[in-house]
Structure formats: structure tokens, C-alpha cells
């Protein structure tokens, strides 16, 4: 891999971009993703941005979707080598403040991940105090020109279902254009629980997509469920980036580097993502890692490679 600077300048594209998935399902695939890139490339190149972001969300009949698009300073092949290894996903996802622990086990045609979630700023002392989210991981496309992985599960915490998390990428020169999307179906109890949570703990928290302009000419950002989901998907995206940036750090120092890198990236979006100071975040993650890491049983697997790698 080429030696590159790890200094990243990010922008959020708030202009309205004219691309939409066709009716009847989620759009994806190399041709569709290439068309999206052509639609937004001018905006993505505004300013000194090595990894610019475009974030959008929507809700239809109780299904919430949020996705982030960006340019990452790695080839698709480098992403393939890193992100087809199940352990890589446990390393990266647990950088997210609300993802406390992760385990995985092999199944016939997939890997079953269990993510342990909690909305607490304190270290998780026991898995009994966390919500479990079980997602099957599959590699759907694997070549030098297109890469796609999917996590999916039928049931989630707080009466949610049909959880889907996907990452796909196409080459753009020596880099990759990446889409990360998260979606789930909300039911009555989950909507009620989220409404209570937002009203109690984060009534003024905002997301990334702009929904208007106030009387002073300042942007108005989305709030509520869509704002919550946008914050989640951007945190997850930044976790992947932080993991990639620290892959070459010696093993004994990598965890500390990952945490600090994730925090650096998240603090670029202080209005949306700031929840605790650096030392608080790092101490929580250290304690959770030391206490919960032994729960992962050894798994003899290096990657989930399909046969169409090019």
C-alpha cells in the first residue's frame, strides 16, 4: 500500500443532489454507484477534502434509512483485503461509543456477529446490561472493480426488525468511492422508546442533512429519528476509516491508535457527534476491552472471500 498522509479534511455536502433509488427496493451495484459518483463528484471535490462526506436519510412506512458516501484514500483491493476478515469488523465497530462488544462465529454460508449495544457513557460491566443485535455477514461482491458486504438480521433491540448494514465500493483513480448504509424497520414500541430517549436525553441533537435555512441564514439540520440514525451511520463510517488508517500500527499500540484516530475524526463534527471528552471515551473503551475481550472464542478464519475476486 502506498505511503499516504493520514491528515484528513472532511466536508459535509448539504446541497440537494438529484439521485434516487428506483421504486420497489434499494438500489446498489457498480453501475448505480458510479452514476451516483458522477452526480455528486463536483460537490465532493469542493474545498481541501481528502475524504468528503455526503449524508442522507429517509423514512417510508416505518423503515428508516441513512447512508453516507465518501472518497477514501485506499484502493478497492486494499478494502477487500481488510474488510473480508471478520475480526476486522469487531475491531472497527467497537470504536463506536454505543457498540460495547462484538463476537462472531462461523456458519455454513456466512458469519454470525453478535453486537452488544448500550446507550451509556459508563463502561459496560456485564453483557446482561446490553442489547444484543445478531447480524449475518456475507460478502456479496468481490473484485477489483466492485466490493460489497452485507450484515442483516430479522430482529433487533427495542422491538425493531429487518436490520441491514452494508458497505460497497468502486474504484476512483487510486482511491475508492464508498457507500455505507444502515436501515431498520421500526414498530410501535421502538418508536415510543426512541421518542422518550430523544426527548429526555438529546432533544436538541442534530443530524447531518440540511432541511432548511433559518431567519439568520444558518442551516437547519434534521433531528429526531433520522438525525439519530445519521449520527449512527457516520460514526460507523468513521470507525471503518479509523481502522483502515491504523492497520500498519504495531499490534501492541494499535488499539490506542484506533481510539485516538476515531476520536479525532468524530470531533470534526462536534455539533453532531461530541458526547464526551477524549480521556472519558478512551477510558470507557479500555475498560470494556479488558473486561469483555476474553469472551470471543478463537475462530480459525482469515476472510470470507468469494470466488470472483479479480
Q: Model features per residue range: what roles?
A:
Residues 54-82, 103-104, 221-228:
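Terminal, regulation- and interaction-focused segments at domain boundaries
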Residues 26-48, 52-54, 154-156, 162, ...:
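Terminal "cap-and-tail" regions of soluble proteins that handle hydrophobic small molecules
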Residues 88-130:
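Short beta-edge strand/loop motif at the mouth of beta-sheet-based domains
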Residues 70, 102, 131-140, 164-171:
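Hydrophobic/aromatic beta-strand elements that line small-molecule binding cavities or substrate pockets
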Residues 18-22:
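N-terminal signal peptide c-region/cleavage motif recognized by signal peptidases
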